[in-house]
Amino acid sequence: MAINTSIPIKLNKGKDAVIISPYVEKWMVKSPAQNDSSQSYYGLGLPLSFIKTLKNNKWSIQSTLILRVNTESFNQKRVLQTGGQILLTYKASENFTYQFGLYANDELFGLFILPRIGIDWIINNRTNLFGLLPGNLNFEYRMSNYFYSGFMQYFFIIKYKI
């Protein structure tokens, strides 16, 4: 179960933005190794992003500070994790944008660094391919103005303090 939202605040006549994206989540895990007993894990997060469009409007840079807690109990010590991400975005055309960057997080086991690559491709007026790897990749087909279908691949890269 997860609840999240993104609150964009436009700046500089809409060219730049601050985005606040708080979330809360709860995971239930059942393990056959432990007689199918279930365990709950909780996550709270507050990503704060700033997007700056560069002079020629084809390039932009996004910097994100991420504060989060992933744990089975909020009574534990050292549950706050701090991290961040830098993404460069290049708009090759009206229909094709790609991204590359770096994610880093102060994990419970030490510094975790992950390269990122993304795509946002409007293949035609009904079909899109978009995502940021590793993380997610989406293929979307618009059947009508109200119905969409497609595929989504979500890669779990979440760690919890136990």
What are these regions (language model features)?
Residues 12-18, 56-61, 95-100, 126-129, ...:
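Repeated loop/turn-to-beta-strand initiation elements of outer-membrane beta-barrel proteins
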Residues 1-3, 38-44, 76-82, 111-115, ...:
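Residues that define the transmembrane beta-barrel architecture of outer-membrane proteins
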Residues 1-72:
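Transmembrane beta-barrel domains of Gram-negative outer membranes and organellar outer membranes
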Residues 10, 22-44, 133-162:
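Outer-membrane beta-barrel translocator/channel fold
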Residues 53-101:
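Hydrophobic alpha-helical segments and helix pairs
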Residues 25-30, 62-67, 94-98, 112-122, ...:
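Flexible, solvent-exposed coil segments and beta strand-coil junctions
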Residues 3-9, 44-52, 84-90, 102, ...:
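Residues on the lipid-exposed face of transmembrane beta-strands in outer-membrane beta-barrel proteins
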